[in-house]
Amino acid sequence: MKATYHGHSVVHIETNGYHIWIDPFLNGNKHTDIKPQDVKADVILLTHGHGDHIGDTIEIAKNNDALVIAPFELATYLGWQGVKTHPLSIGGGREFEFGKVKLTQAFHGSAIIDEDAKTITYTGMPSGILFTAEGKTIYHAGDTALFSDMKLIGELNHIELAFLPIGDNFTMGPDDARIAAEWLRAKQVVPVHYSTFPPIEQDPHAFADSLHGGVGHVLNSGQSIEI
């Protein structure tokens, strides 16, 4: 299984011939190396409804006839936009032909904000994602704050690779993400959700170097990890 980082919180997983994308925010993502029209996707996994995580989901899903798996309310909203969806709720998981997807809790907001119309559409509880295929598990934490049940997630799951936000301001900062990495017991940790916008400027190398056991890895956009 291969996981490729594409800037901000965008992750592309390749497993058994399937292309699975998490939070494909590409247009407006200054760090990405790929355009929505160039994406090949079978499945899109969404952590929550903010624009920098939904991103180009609708375009990519329609271009590829891809399945979108998201928290219930967000999946319902996207279904109204003509997208093929499967809803999950926090704590719920499901086996698909490409792997198992389970949503964990996450602590932050989730809404679609229309600046022009001055409207905010509630999109349900935000989530983290546990994705398991080929006997290995990847955890994507979304935009979460640090929370103590990360210890339980680490105890119940053998996490090969964790993508943790470090940007601070809107998510965990590096100090809390360092604690999260210890609690999750992940074999490899990649920092995400940093330096895309001025309020979340961080040094990912300093964070990665601070993790015990050499588990931290900084990926530039387009770089991959094999697990």
From Swiss-Prot:
SUPFAM superfamilies: Metallo-hydrolase/oxidoreductase
Entry superkingdom: Bacteria
Keywords: Hydrolase
Gene Ontology MF annotations: hydrolase activity
InterPro entries, per the entry: Metallo-B-lactamas, RibonucZ/Hydroxyglut_hydro, UPF0173
Coiled-coil parts of chain: none
Cysteines joined through disulfide linkages: none
Family: Belongs to the UPF0173 family.
NCBIfam families registered for this protein in UniProt: PRK00685.1
Name used for this protein in its record: UPF0173 metal-dependent hydrolase BPUM_2573
